[in-house]
Amino acid sequence: MPARWGCLFPGKYPCQTGLRHMSDRASVIYILDDDNAVLEALSSLVRSIGLSVECFSSASVFLNDVNRSACGCLILDVRMPEMSGLDVQRQLKELGEQIPIIFISGHGDIPMAVKAIKAGAVDFFTKPFREEELLGAIRAALKLAPQQRSNAPRVSELKENYESLSKREQQVLKFVLRGYLNKQTALELDISEATVKVHRHNIMRKMKVSSIQDLVRVTERLKDSLE
C-alpha cells in the first residue's frame, strides 16, 4: 500500500471481500477533495468494486459540471480552500439537488459533523477510517439516491410552478402559509370566501401538491430563490 493511503485506510488496501453486490454501473460516485492523493486513493477503492467515479478538486467546478441526471452519491471533504463542504452541501440543497452526501474530514470536528448530519448527510468520517465503513456508507447512500430523486422535484421546477400562479393566487398563498383560515384570508383581501377556496384549489393544482403540508414543504425549499 502506498504510504499516502495510510492516512485514509489503516490496513490492507483494497478490501474486496463480500462487496461484489455493490457494483452498479448506473450509479456514479462523485468525489470532491482538494487533495489529489486522497482523490486517487478513494477513486481506486470505489473503482475496485465496479462503481463509476468522477473526481473533482474544485467545488465550483463540481457545482457547475456535475451530471445532475446521474444517480449516485457524493464523497465530500469538509475543509477545502475555495469552499467548505458544508457550503457545498447548502448550495446543492438550494439548487434542489438531493444527492446523498458522505463527508470526510482530517479533523475530529464533532460540531461540524452534527451540522452535516442534521442537514441530511448520510455519514461523516474522520481520517483515518476503515474502508469497509466507507463502502458501507456508499451502499446506504446508493439505496437512498433513487428515492430522493424521485421524491424531490428540482427548485427550478418548483419555481416554474410558483411563477405560473396569478398575482392573486400568490397573495392567497402567503396567507395560507401563515395559517390563515379561508374566512380570514377573504377579509384580508376583501374577496369572498368562495373565491379564496377557488384560489386555494388552483394553487394546489399548479404547485402539484396534494396537502397543505406538502405546500409548506415545497415553498420552504423555494424561499431562498424567491427572496
From Swiss-Prot:
Phosphorylated by TodS. The keyword Transcription applies. Residues 182-201 bind DNA. One of its GO terms (biological process) is phosphorelay signal transduction system. Its main location: cytoplasm. One of its GO terms (molecular function) is transcription cis-regulatory region binding. Residues 28-142 form the Response regulatory domain. Residues 158-223 form the HTH luxR-type domain. The keyword Lipid biosynthesis does not apply. Induction: Constitutively expressed. Is under catabolite repression. GO terms for cellular component: cytoplasm; protein-DNA complex. Phosphorylation by TodS probably induces conformational changes, which allow or alter the interaction with RNA polymerase in a process assisted by the integration host factor (IHF). Keywords: Activator, Cytoplasm, DNA-binding, Phosphoprotein, Transcription, Transcription regulation, Two-component regulatory system. InterPro entries: CheY-like_superfamily, Sig_transdc_resp-reg_C-effctor, Sig_transdc_resp-reg_receiver, Tscrpt_reg_LuxR_C, WH-like_DNA-bd_sf. It is found in: Cytoplasm. The modification 4-aspartylphosphate is found at residue 77. Member of the two-component regulatory system TodS/TodT involved in the regulation of toluene degradation. Phosphorylated TodT activates transcription of the tod operon (todXFC1C2BADEGIH). Binds specifically to three boxes in the tod promoter region in a cooperative manner. Boxes-1 and -2 are pseudopalindromes and Box-3 is a half-palindrome. Monomer. This is Response regulator protein TodT. It comes from Pseudomonas putida (strain DOT-T1E).
